[in-house]
Structure formats: structure tokens, C-alpha cells
Amino acid sequence: MTPLKVVFAGTPEFARAALEAIAAAGHEIALVLSQPDRPAGRGMKLQASPVKQCAVAHGWPVAQPRSLRLDGKYPQDAAAAREALLAARPDVMVVAAYGLILPQWVLDLPVHGCLNIHASLLPRWRGAAPIHRAIEAGDAQTGITIMQMDAGLDTGDMLLREAVDIGSDTTARLHDRLAELGGRLIVQALADIGRLARTPQPAEGVTYASKVEKHEAQIDWNQPADAIVRRIRAFDPFPGANSLLDGETIKLWAAHAAPPAEVSAAPGTLLAVSDAGVAVAAAGSVVMATELQRPGGKRLAVADFLRGFDLKPGQRFG
């Protein structure tokens, strides 16, 4: 394998796994692009992204432009990034959950263009939140697609794809599995760069994975139990599915659909409470919640939760 000069663009933990895999495979990390530091945590102190933290730890050069558009809101940032990219003289640019739009001048700059690691089986779930949306929709499988980027939103030709079963995964667990797979596939793609067949994405089966908003986390108990349970899994760890109970926001972190039963109580009503779980009426079905959290508290198995919070049948989420 001939080592390549790689520019890597990414921001969250998902991208860090790929960056480390590329470096471990012997490629030169010529430059790392990541989003600017953001306020985070209870103190809202500026915090570097996981990708920047990784780059700093390894001594790789980092640029954090607010935009790459030379004619956009931050032309000085874009111009400085362009100089850094030109100086890096990359063979290829690898992009994973970067968060900035790449204008055409960026796509054209590397010898082999820009490769993207996308956490879905394209063309299903193009966009910002493919892992969450695949779980929420009840998909049996998802996976990783390595694509040759073009100017569209996740519309480029596919180079490699590999599927995984979702099973009962939460977004947190599936994220980690796909991050590892993405690292393995991008290393394979770089080893075969210039020789991989490019497959255009089919026009059929296109769906879009919109960004997850906090307001979506509020549980609608008028939905069937299966749909509610999928949403609980999809929104773990962010934003955390929740529901109001006597004026307090309770997060539900784990649940399953109870065996089919005839339910006459209003949706959201607590039907039974025990150390095994809290049974809640849904649309013609029952959700059995097994892990809960109060504001400011920890995630607790229901038996531990009930030691500090009294729940009774007849109370109602809503």
C-alpha cells in the first residue's frame, strides 16, 4: 500500500474513529478540519470537538473555519482554509460528519477528490441524522456507505457499502458499531483508491434524515407501543425521550412493548407499577418502561427509581 497524504474533515466522536483508523493504516494526516470550539457542559465553557482533540493529541495541524465558502459570511475563514488546503497538497480528502458544506473548489482540490463516510445504506437516509432515523423508522438494517462526494446532499457515487443488523440497538450502541465499520471501510477504500467501481445511487428509495430537534423527544402516547419504544431507542443518548408527569419531566431510557392486551385506559395512564417495570397505556397497546430519570438525577433501573419516586397506577403521563 502506498501511503496517501490525507486531509480529514470531521467533528464528532463518529469521525474520530475514522481519523484514528486512517492514521493507524499508515497514511499521512496532512491537515485536519473540524468545527470551531463550542460552549458545552454545565459551565458552557468552550470545548474542542472530539476530532480536534484527537488531532492535537497526535500533533496534526488543525484548521477550524466557520465556513468554506469564499463568497459567504466568513470569507476570511474560507480564504485561510484554502491556503492551508493548498499547502497540504492532499491526495484525497476524507469527510465524516463534518457539518460544513463543501463548495466545489474543495471537492476539486485533492487529486482523488473527497470521500465521505455516511452512516446509512444510501440512498436511504441522506442527511444529518441517519442513525436516529433508521431506528425510529423500524429499519431492520442500516450500514455504512463510502461515496465519492459531489455538490449534492449525500448524492455522490457509491464506492463501498456494508450492512449491519440494527436489532434492539439504541443510537448510542449503533453509533459505536457504525463508527468502527466506517473506519474499516475507509481504510479499505484508501487502499484501493482509483480502482474502486463507482456506482450511481438509484433514484428509487431516497429518504432524508432530518436533524433531531429537542421537541421531538416528547413522547406521544397516542402512538402504538412499538413506535414509542423505537423512539426511546432512537433518542438515546440525545435528546432523551421524555414525558411530563405531575409537572415533572421524566426521561424514559429503556422500554419494551408488553404482550398484546386490551387497553381501555387513556393513553399515557400508568396501568401497573413494580420493580419489573412501569406499564403505560399507549394506542391499543402497553409500553413497559424499565429505565427512568428525573430532572437532575441519574438514569436508573425502575426498581432503583421507585425507591426515591412514588409512582402509582392511575397517574398519567401527558
Swiss-Prot record:
It holds the Pfam family Formyl_trans_C. InterPro entries: Fmt (IPR005794), Formyl_trans_C (IPR005793), Formyl_trans_C_sf (IPR037022), Formyl_transf_N (IPR002376), Formyl_transf_N_sf (IPR036477), Formyl_transferase-like_C_sf (IPR011034), GART_AS (IPR001555), Met-tRNA-FMT_C (IPR044135). It comes from the Bacteria. GO terms for molecular function: methionyl-tRNA formyltransferase activity. One of its GO terms (cellular component) is cytosol. It catalyses: L-methionyl-tRNA(fMet) + (6R)-10-formyltetrahydrofolate = N-formyl-L-methionyl-tRNA(fMet) + (6S)-5,6,7,8-tetrahydrofolate + H(+). Its EC number is 2.1.2.9. (6S)-5,6,7,8-tetrahydrofolate binds at S120, L121, L122, P123. SUPFAM superfamilies: FMT C-terminal domain-like, Formyltransferase. The keyword Repressor does not apply. Keywords: Protein biosynthesis, Transferase. Attaches a formyl group to the free amino group of methionyl-tRNA(fMet). The formyl group appears to play a dual role in the initiator identity of N-formylmethionyl-tRNA by promoting its recognition by IF2 and preventing the misappropriation of this tRNA by the elongation apparatus. Belongs to the Fmt family. PANTHER family: METHIONYL-TRNA FORMYLTRANSFERASE, METHIONYL-TRNA FORMYLTRANSFERASE, MITOCHONDRIAL. This is Methionyl-tRNA formyltransferase. It comes from Variovorax paradoxus (strain S110).
